[in-house]
Amino acid sequence: MQYIELLIMFLSVLLAVAFLTVAERKTLGYMQRRVGPNAVGYYGILMAIADAAKLLLKEIVVPTHADKLILFVSPMISLISALLCWSVIPFAPGVTIYDSNYGFILTLAISSVGVFGTLLAGWSANSKYSLLGSIRSTAQLISYELVLTTIILLCILIGGTMNVSKYIEIQQAIWYGIPLLPLAIIFFIGCVAECARPPFDNVEAESELVSGHMTEYSSSIFVLFFLSEYASILFLSTLTAILFMGGGTGIILGLKANLFAFTYIWVRATLPRVRYDKLINLCWMIFLPILFGSAIAVPAYLYALDAIIILYRPGGL
């Protein structure tokens, strides 16, 4: 039964990715004062199906000196990692594929495996552009995983549980995004960098690295990387909605997640690319010192609050 639920979830995520790509192209079209996709289906809504058909019907071109096994396996690692993260997301009360008391730890462990897909893709292609792109990607992803992990640990410290489902109940009185607004903003910036989306798309900067670690990929194996990127965007948008906006059930959670997913598109259309050294400095010189300072301040504040409550409750100590 659990395998059927996993299959339904995977297909639902892939369908959502298809519509997200259409929404992105339409939104970018409006923001750049052009029409965007409008020929395939009503209002261009079936453009994703046309794109998928075009890519899947093309020939898979494998570089002569590439390590063929790793070249084919690496996009699968990225996609499976991106899809398995969804198994701990509570879509409604009791509707979770794997409702674990260690949900956040599992999420961090599974998502970190996706870095290996990117690294191996760049190395196996035997191309300097791919290799440079994968090195950049690995450094960027590892750096910003530290940011996301630290913020999640701070939320665990405040919430007192690692079960993702519990955070919907905990935030019924007040969303974490209100008292922890600076952390929520840092978390969102970290999510954009973790997905290597503009303005942090130095991994596949067209003017420098063609398509980064995906330069030598074509047809269906390129589609796997494409799907993993957009599945990660939707997952991190949903996780942000649960952590800082109280999550929700069904359509409410979907609306909150779509709000964050739209922000990714908005940022792409608005901001220019950040220079790579400034991106890494932003993580190590600004975000991490702030977060480590918060990691000291938040427990001290919680213990002080507990002491005040104990001291002034009827009967005192």
Swiss-Prot record:
Free-text function comment from the UniProt entry: Core subunit of the mitochondrial membrane respiratory chain NADH dehydrogenase (Complex I) that is believed to belong to the minimal assembly required for catalysis. Complex I functions in the transfer of electrons from NADH to the respiratory chain. The immediate electron acceptor for the enzyme is believed to be ubiquinone.
GO biological process: aerobic respiration; mitochondrial electron transport, NADH to ubiquinone
Protein's membrane topology: Multi-pass membrane protein
The protein, known as: NADH-ubiquinone oxidoreductase chain 1
Gene Ontology CC annotation, any one: respiratory chain complex I
Major enzyme class: translocase
Cellular location(s): Mitochondrion inner membrane
Disulphide-bridged cysteine pairs: none
Enzymatic reactions: a ubiquinone + NADH + 5 H(+)(in) = a ubiquinol + NAD(+) + 4 H(+)(out)
Gene behind the chain: NAD1
Similarity field: Belongs to the complex I subunit 1 family.
Pfam families: NADHdh
Source taxon at top rank: Eukaryota
TM spans (from-to): 3-23, 37-57, 69-89, 103-123, 141-161, 173-193, 207-227, 247-267, 282-302
EC number: 7.1.1.2
Key words, A-Z: Electron transport, Membrane, Mitochondrion, Mitochondrion inner membrane, NAD, Respiratory chain, Translocase, Transmembrane, Transmembrane helix, Transport, Ubiquinone
InterPro entries: NADH_UbQ_OxRdtase_su1/FPO, NADH_UbQ_OxRdtase_su1_CS
Any one GO MF annotation of this record: NADH dehydrogenase (ubiquinone) activity
